[in-house]
Amino acid sequence: MSRQLSRARPATVLGAMEMGRRMDAPTSAAVTRAFLERGHTEIDTAFLYSDGQSETILGGLGLRMGSSDCRVKIATKANPWIGNSLKPDSVRSQLETSLKRLQCPRVDLFYLHAPDHSAPVEETLRACHQLHQEGKFVELGLSNYAAWEVAEICTLCKSNGWILPTVYQGMYSATTRQVETELFPCLRHFGLRFYAYNPLAGGLLTGKYKYEDKDGKQPVGRFFGTQWAEIYRNHFWKEHHFEGIALVEKALQAAYGASAPSMTSAALRWMYHHSQLQGAHGDAVILGMSSLEQLEQNLAAAEEGPLEPAVVDAFNQAWHLFAHECPNYFI
């Protein structure tokens, strides 16, 4: 659905997943500096990212995160994967390890990265409340939970007097809109803001890939050569997705001619101006990158204006082409 220009623009968050993986420490420092110099303040990492190197690199930047007078806000996440769980001991261990890596006394936002169906959710939430009371984090967030789980968690927290979640981080882009149907109404009801990850559908909405690329040898990246590549291909690498992207590229040429914005720019402008994100609610877009140049391009696109109506219509057509294959927003 198209939105008016007058609405408040969603915030921008720096996604630090590639720090320590495709970006070394000096590049990560340059990226962070460039992001902060544009006036943005929120950084998103996780216990899991780059086997802890993302947090360690951020901790070594001297940002004094977690101090009362620091304008930089840091978020991290505890996960139920690779030998971890969301049982109380593991949640505590992960958060305390993250604080050591980040060299800060507390984080501004602490997420449960995904549901742990082997751990009673009441125990997890009680542990989070205890950690909050100890001053180890300010806000509680959820990521990759189903709408009914969000409702259950909010109800449990309210009835027990525990800290309530205030942020949900989920997958959302111009061609992956499953969150709009039931999750967004749930979040609005319970007062959670929404932070969108994968706004470029894992990079597919850059337009640099072709469907046939999967059959040949490709350089290491989001879709090839990493431990996450198969997951991303299973999520996004569908023939209908590429057909939808071609529709948008055609509409861009028809609407703008020789001055047509890039596919990346168009996809990000859709997020900021035509999605269901609302800056007035505190919603945000998480921008990831694997280089300083990529970040600067994405930040520039995020500052541009709305798209021509014909391009917005083409994105809607692309979504309807791919909707039946859209990956679930929950795990």
Swiss-Prot record:
Coiled-coil region list: none
Residues the entry annotates as binding substrate: 113, 232
Positions annotated as active site in the UniProt record: 49
Binding locations of NADP(+): 44, 143-144, 169, 198-208, 222, 290-298
A Pfam family annotated for this UniProt entry: Aldo_ket_red
Annotated site residues (Lowers pKa of active site Tyr) in this chain: 77
GO cellular component, one term: cytoplasm
Entries under InterPro entries matching the protein: AKR_Detox_Biosynth (IPR050523), NADP_OxRdtase_dom (IPR023210), NADP_OxRdtase_dom_sf (IPR036812)
Assigned EC number: 1.-.-.-
Tissue specificity as recorded in UniProt: Mainly expressed in uterus.
Enzyme class: oxidoreductase
Keywords noted in UniProt: NADP, Oxidoreductase, Phosphoprotein
MF-aspect GO terms: aldo-keto reductase (NADPH) activity
Function: Can reduce the dialdehyde protein-binding form of aflatoxin B1 (AFB1) to the non-binding AFB1 dialcohol. May be involved in protection of liver against the toxic and carcinogenic effects of AFB1, a potent hepatocarcinogen.
Record PANTHER family: NAD(P)-LINKED OXIDOREDUCTASE SUPERFAMILY PROTEIN, NADH-SPECIFIC METHYLGLYOXAL REDUCTASE-RELATED
Similarity annotation: Belongs to the aldo/keto reductase family. Aldo/keto reductase 2 subfamily.
Protein's recorded name: Aflatoxin B1 aldehyde reductase member 4
Gene (UniProt): AKR7L
